């Protein structure tokens, strides 16, 4: 089978790196059953009868080992660009003391006991505490073979902030990295989702959460991460959109730097190459999708659930959690619940939104003249305010703060019709493969666990042009993975009308 050869070559390549004697003989891998076991254990499961989907198997050799004793922390973002390069947004501040034992004290950084500390605030009175390891920079670029091409940015890249992300230029690195996107012009966009910790600092309040005295490499101390940043591929700062708010406001249009809209903990970013419009999933505090000009950052429009504009923040906050609504029979919330976690645009103009706080996805038409404009759709009707349809994703799943909710990330298969919709679920730890035409479930990829091909807090899903899938985990998952595609290029047939639910 082609996939056995493909995976065998990948594993043989890994063996070469490790110096294994059997590296050149991929037949050994086939004969001892390793490849068959990988295919059986990490392939598509819960397949709907009479349907077709791409097939996958994990590549346990990807990525290649990182240099400089670097380790990845939680992965706040992952995206495959037009060159089939994989861009990763690492959270170095999520690493624990034992994971960064090789890190030394930061010059002049002391804790409350006047003891030298490293960049994450862990005490280093005698220099490095162990032989391993160091936090990798925040932005990393890999090729499809897993080779690291570039790495830059953030609080674990000493000296970079002073040169490339200066407050005088408008750059503020987020307190917690979240979301990365590379547009058709090779601009790198990132966001963050730190919440504001209390009153403004000038009024004696707390600093933004996660940027206190434990973090001498603290970045955003002014408020919540209410902005996104634009860089070139080498990490040179180009623009900031947004500000550092102290409260959420899902209808802000121009409260940020240079009159740009202020976000509140934005989660995801995409740029439409046909219109140069920037779409932001806003987010962990606000409850909307923002549309802005990708060159100037200026506001164009915004919309909430079912295309409603303005967004009723008060009603959403008063409603509480989705499981409570569901238990009470209120099964059609007229607002996004936090977090609004992703926004994606298909080639046919459909916009897909992860309404993670409501365990659902919603679909909109980017070409609708009503989308983003003041519009009322009180009954959630398709065809009004740019709204097209929706699908529940394991809708009985608990949401924050009990469980993280379901619809966390989406992407499309690279066939001409983009016929598959991949939906990541970071509570049930799987990727649902939907027929994008009818939003029925055709199968699943991955299960909960720590082994290759399994997930813990699955956070991102992104394909390359060949159909291979790349994934990223947060919480204690802290890894990126590659799934090799084989078999059909796209999806067809009508699967299970209900997406999610317990299955073997």
Label every PLM stretch briefly:
Residues 8-19:
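Bacterial N-terminal signal peptides
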